[in-house]
C-alpha cells in the first residue's frame, strides 16, 4: 500500500523518466502541443531536441482571420514558429517531418525546411502545402537537389499546389526510398528517367497532376518505368498539357504491381506494357483536344497508329481482375472497339457514365470478358443520337421480336454476369447544375436505391 501511495501521491512521475523516453512520448503529439510542454519547467525546454517526429499543422496554430492582412499575419507567425522549433532542435537527428500548411505565404521557406531536415538524416518527409499563387502557370519552385541523394529517406510525399520543378544533379541515389508521391510538378523526360532509375527499392509511386517540361528534349522521347519491387503505381498526368504526349514513348515493366491508376492521353507509342501481377486497375484514357475536334457525329477520330497504341496498352493490363473505366476511356473505346483484347481474368467491371458519352463500345467490351461476374454502372447516362432510334444501334434500347416481346441484347444474354449494380440509380443529371449540388443529390439517390435492394 505504501508503494501505491508513493506512486500516485501527486508526484511528477513523467519528469523522472529519461530524457530520451520523454522525447519519444512527445513525438506522438502534434508539435505545437509538444512545444507547449516547455512552459512546465525549465527542464522541459531542451527535451524538444529528443523529439524525433515533427508534425506541423497550421490549422491547429492559427486563429480565425477575417481579413487578408490577418491571414498573412497568422501565416507569418506559423512559419516563424516552425523556424523556431527547427532552430531549437539544432542538429538533432529526426525521423519524420510532416507539414500540413494551408496558408503558406512563401514556399521558399518550406524548401529551406527540407534542406534542414535532410541534414539530420530524416527518413520520412510529408508536405501538403497550399499556395497563394494563381494556378498551374505560376512560377515553379525547384526542389533542393540534395533530396535526391538522401541515403536515409524511406518515404517522400510532396504536394505543392504552387507547383514544383524537379531537377536533379549528376546522379540520383535513393537506396532506401519505398514510397514516393509527387503532386503538381514539372519535370523533363530525361530527368524523370534518371529519377526512376535511382529508386531501386521503390514499392509505391504516385505522380498526380504533372506536366512534361518540353524544353531541350530530343524526339522521340522515351520514358521508362522499370521498378522490380513496385506494387502500387498511380500515373495521372495534367490534362491541360496533353499535346506534350505527342512525342512520348512509354515503357512500363513492373512485374509486381498489383494496383494501377493510369490517367493520361494516348501516348505516341507504348513500347512495352507489362504488369504480370496486376489485380486492380483504374483507367482514364482521354482524347486530346485535336482528336475531339475532328469528330464526325458521335464518332471521334483517331488514327490507326493511335488505335494500335490503345490496344497495346490494354493488352498489357488484360490480366487484371478488377477494372474501372472512366467515361473518357469509354469514349476512346468507341474509336477502337474492334481491337479490344480479351480480359480473361476480369471478374468485376465498373463503367463511369456521363451524358455526353455513347455506349456503343460496351457490347464489344462485354463480349471480351468471358469470366465477368459483377458489372457496375456509375449512373445510367449516355448521349442521345440518331442511333437511339435504331433498335440494333443502341444498347439502352430494348429490341423486340416479331410478336412484340422484349428480347435481351446478345451481349447481355451471353454474358456470364451474375451481379449488376447501378450507382446513383434514378439520378437526373443536369449538365448546367453545380457539381456540389449533384453530389448532394447522389447521396439521397444512393440511399434510396440501397433500400430498394433490401426490399
Curated annotation (Swiss-Prot):
The keyword DNA damage does not apply. SUPFAM superfamilies: F-box domain (SSF81383), RNI-like (SSF52047). LRR repeats lie at residues 14-39, 157-184, 190-209, 211-237, 322-353, 354-379, 396-424. Keywords: Leucine-rich repeat, Repeat. Residues 11-59 form the F-box domain. It holds the Pfam family F-box. This is Putative F-box/LRR-repeat protein At5g41630. The keyword Transcription does not apply. CDD domains: F-box_AtFBL13-like.
Amino acid at each position: 500500500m505504501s508503494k501505491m501511495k508513493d506512486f500516485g501521491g501527486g508526484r511528477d512521475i513523467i519528469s523522472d523518466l529519461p530524457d530520451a523516453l520523454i522525447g519519444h512520448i512527445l513525438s506522438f503529439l502534434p508539435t505545437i502541443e509538444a512545444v507547449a510542454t516547455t512552459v512546465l519547467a525549465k527542464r522541459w525546454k531542451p527535451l524538444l531536441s529528443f523529439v524525433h517526429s515533427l508534425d506541423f499543422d497550421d490549422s491547429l496554430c492559427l486563429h480565425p482571420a477575417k481579413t487578408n492582412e490577418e491571414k498573412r499575419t497568422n501565416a507569418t507567425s506559423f512559419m516563424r514558429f516552425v523556424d523556431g522549433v527547427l532552430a531549437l532542435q539544432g542538429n538533432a537527428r529526426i525521423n519524420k517531418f510532416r507539414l500540413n500548411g494551408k496558408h503558406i505565404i512563401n514556399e521558399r521557406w518550406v524548401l529551406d525546411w527540407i534542406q534542414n531536415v535532410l541534414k539530420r538524416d530524416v527518413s520520412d518527409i510529408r508536405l501538403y502545402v497550399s499556395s497563394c499563387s494563381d494556378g498551374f502557370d505560376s512560377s515553379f519552385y525547384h526542389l533542393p537537389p540534395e533530396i535526391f541523394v538522401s541515403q536515409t529517406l524511406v518515404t517522400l510525399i510532396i504536394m505543392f499546389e504552387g507547383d514544383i520543378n524537379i531537377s536533379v544533379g549528376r546522379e540520383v541515389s535513393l537506396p532506401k526510398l519505398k514510397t514516393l508521391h509527387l503532386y503538381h510538378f514539372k519535370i523533363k523526360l530525361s530527368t524523370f528517367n534518371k529519377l526512376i532509375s535511382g529508386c531501386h527499392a521503390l514499392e509505391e509511386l504516385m505522380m498526380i497532376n504533372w506536366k512534361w517540361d518540353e524544353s531541350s528534349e530530343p524526339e522521340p522521347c522515351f520514358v521508362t518505368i522499370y521498378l522490380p519491387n513496385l506494387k502500387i503505381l498511380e500515373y495521372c498526368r495534367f490534362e491541360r498539357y496533353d499535346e506534350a504526349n505527342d512525342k512520348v514513348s512509354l515503357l512500363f515493366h513492373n512485374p509486381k504491381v498489383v494496383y494501377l491508376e493510369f490517367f493520361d492521353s494516348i501516348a505516341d507509342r507504348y513500347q512495352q506494357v507489362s504488369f504480370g501481377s496486376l489485380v486492380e486497375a483504374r483507367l482514364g484514357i482521354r482524347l486530346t483536344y485535336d482528336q475531339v475536334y475532328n469528330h464526325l457525329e458521335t464518332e471521334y477520330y483517331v488514327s490507326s497508329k493511335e488505335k494500335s497504341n490503345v490496344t497495346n496498352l490494354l493488352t498489357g493490363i488484360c490480366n487484371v481482375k478488377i477494372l474501372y473505366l472512366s467515361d473518357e476511356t469509354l469514349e476512346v473505346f468507341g474509336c477502337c472497339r474492334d481491337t479490344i483484347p480479351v480480359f480473361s481474368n476480369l471478374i468485376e467491371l465498373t463503367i463511369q457514365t456521363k451524358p455526353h458519352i455513347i455506349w456503343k463500345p460496351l457490347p464489344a467490351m462485354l463480349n471480351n470478358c468471358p469470366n465477368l461476374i459483377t458489372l457496375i454502372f456509375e449512373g445510367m447516362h449516355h448521349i442521345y443520337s440518331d442511333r437511339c432510334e435504331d433498335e440494333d444501334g443502341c444498347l439502352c434500347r430494348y429490341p423486340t421480336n416479331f410478336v412484340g416481346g422484349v428480347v435481351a441484347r446478345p451481349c447481355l444474354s451471353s454474358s456470364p454476369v451474375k451481379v449488376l449494380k447501378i450507382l446513383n440509380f434514378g439520378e437526373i443529371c443536369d449538365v448546367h447544375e453545380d457539381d456540389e449540388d449533384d453530389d448532394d443529390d447522389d447521396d439521397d439517390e444512393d440511399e434510396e436505391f440501397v433500400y430498394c435492394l433490401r426490399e
